[in-house]
Amino acid sequence: MDQISIEGVKLSQELVTINLRHLTHIEKTLSQFCKNLTDNQINMQFLSTMRVDGNNQITCCVDSENSGFINSLIRSEPELQSHSEIIEPTGLLTLFPHHFKLKLLGLSLSVLGKASIPLYGLASSLSSLTFILAYHDLEKAIECLGEKIKIDPEKIERRPKIRVRQSRRLKQ
């Protein structure tokens, strides 16, 4: 079988994944949650919302250095406390196909499953396919995927070259 070619791969730094499920007021909860992150200068590396059979879910990932704040925030909000799951440490593995092929999604899921690599989340677009995995499984995932997908080692961004942080400094 021919390998599927992709344009590149990106691995994130160590993250914390937060799942908020079965939310009564998703818009209000998401708005307040995002406001709390913004007020505390915390950037989200990943955000996804979905609704299945009337149940709402928000999944987001933030830098692991914010783990303490996230845990405190969830403990302080009754709506969050009873509907949250925190998974850490996690990381994002993003594949950049030349053209999106459904075959790449199926093949990736099959390879990760056969390698017993837990999948905590997934998002896709025309230009990328992103998996939330245990942080310590990122390199193993690349190795396993490399057996079925043509990955140029030169096009693997192992960690972000630039880290962006928010600042309270105001323009004068």
How should these model regions be labeled?
Residues 1-172:
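A conserved regulatory-domain signal marking ACT and ACT-like small-molecule sensing domains
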